[in-house]
């Protein structure tokens, strides 16, 4: 059981290489929301 589990874990990163560009962008999403809130507040005059 253990060797099978380790083998599966070793193969998962290779299987997800297709999604590497998306994963690189994911940490920026909260920053985009922060920027959106700032622009929105600037548009309404920081009420």
Swiss-Prot record:
Keywords: Membrane, Photosynthesis, Photosystem II, Reaction center, Thylakoid, Transmembrane, Transmembrane helix. The keyword DNA damage does not apply. The chain crosses the membrane at residues 26-46. GO terms for biological process: photosynthesis. One of the components of the core complex of photosystem II (PSII). PSII is a light-driven water:plastoquinone oxidoreductase that uses light energy to abstract electrons from H(2)O, generating O(2) and a proton gradient subsequently used for ATP formation. It consists of a core antenna complex that captures photons, and an electron transfer chain that converts photonic excitation into a charge separation. Belongs to the PsbK family. This is Photosystem II reaction center protein K. The lineage of its organism: Bacteria, Bacillati, Cyanobacteriota, Cyanophyceae, Synechococcales.
